[in-house]
Amino acid sequence: MAAELLEQPVLGSRRLSNILVAAMVTIGGVGFLFASLSSYLGRDLLPLGHPAGLVFVPQGLVMGLYSIAAALLATYLWAVIAIDVGSGSNRFDKQAGVITISRRGFRKPISVEIPLKDVQAVKVEVRDGFNTRRRVSLRVQGRRDMPLTRVGEPLPLAQLEQDGAELARFLGVNLEGL
């Protein structure tokens, strides 16, 4: 039974890099808010610098607008992290003859079912340079290639090759792209 089913978890947006970016945007937004309030009130609310010396119009006002923009961006980033957008699984079931690719979307879950007989090959794509892309995808008859790897940080090349070869062996199809 275990040889008939392969399930691969996919990491979503709940990663350390995303949490650090959201924290930095939050801290920066709070800093701009305190600088704007310091300029408006005429006394320093920040331990660094001397923001009370800034003229409220236009400098303090612009910093207040920056703090609002940072608050909106931080709210979006924390919501994406809390929902864990992009997480899910790839489930390959030989017994049922179906592949189920499921991901958590922003508003609702996304699930795609592909008949096992429509899979032509497993494709490993490696593109280095400015816009690096390393992914494993399924070449499906009558459809675009279906990506299986997570979005964001590229996988190490050795792990990418191993995952592609293991999946091609399990499905009994060719491995392309190496």
UniProtKB/Swiss-Prot annotation:
The keyword Transmembrane helix applies. GO terms for cellular component: photosystem I; plasma membrane-derived thylakoid membrane. It comes from the Bacteria. Pfam families: Ycf4 (PF02392). Keywords: Membrane, Photosynthesis, Thylakoid, Transmembrane, Transmembrane helix. InterPro entries: PSI_Ycf4_assembly. It is a multi-pass membrane protein. It is found in: Cellular thylakoid membrane. One of its GO terms (biological process) is photosynthesis. The chain crosses the membrane at residues 19-39, 61-81. Seems to be required for the assembly of the photosystem I complex. Belongs to the Ycf4 family. This is Photosystem I assembly protein Ycf4. It comes from Synechococcus sp. (strain WH7803). The gene is ycf4.
